[in-house]
Regions:
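Active-site nucleotide/adenylate-binding loops and adjacent lid/helix of ATP-dependent enzymes
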Residues: 1-76
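ATP-dependent carboxylate/phosphate-activation module, predominantly the ATP-grasp catalytic core
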Residues: 45-124
């Protein structure tokens, strides 16, 4: 549930691991560009990416169109060889469980986006 994100931003403003997030579009979000995300959305569904010039950069469809939204500072994923890449990590039993890369031709990574090759090597 993304409703926690504006609360976290209020509790920890300018934290390096958080993006400015609000329940409405504020002046700072208008200046930087922002993502519109359904509070209870999943897998990149129903996301709009709006530039600082108020232009629609990308959008995705889905079944969460009638949900309340949050508005989050725009931070575009890095483009590697023509794909926008998202690094996903997860834990199992409180320990590192794994990492995968999701890649898509569009700015929004979705459920059907590709799983990209990844190898983890031990530090020397």
């Amino acid at each position: 549930n993304k409703a926690i994100l504006p609360v976290l931003w209020q509790l920890f403003p300018n934290h390096r691991y958080l993006l400015d997030t609000d329940f409405e579009v504020n002046d700072l979000l208008k200046q930087t560009g922002y993502a519109v995300k359904p509070i209870a959305g999943r897998c990149g569904s129903n996301i709009d990416l709006i530039s600082a010039q108020d232009e629609l950069l990308d959008k995705s469809s889905g079944k969460f169109v009638d949900r309340k939204n949050i508005y989050q500072r725009l931070w575009c994923l890095p483009n590697v060889d023509g794909k926008y890449i998202q690094v996903c990590t997860f834990t199992v039993g409180g320990n590192y469980g794994g990492t995968c890369l999701r890649g898509d031709d569009s700015l929004v990574v979705k459920k059907e986006s590709d799983i990209e090759p990844l190898i983890v090597v031990k530090d020397k």
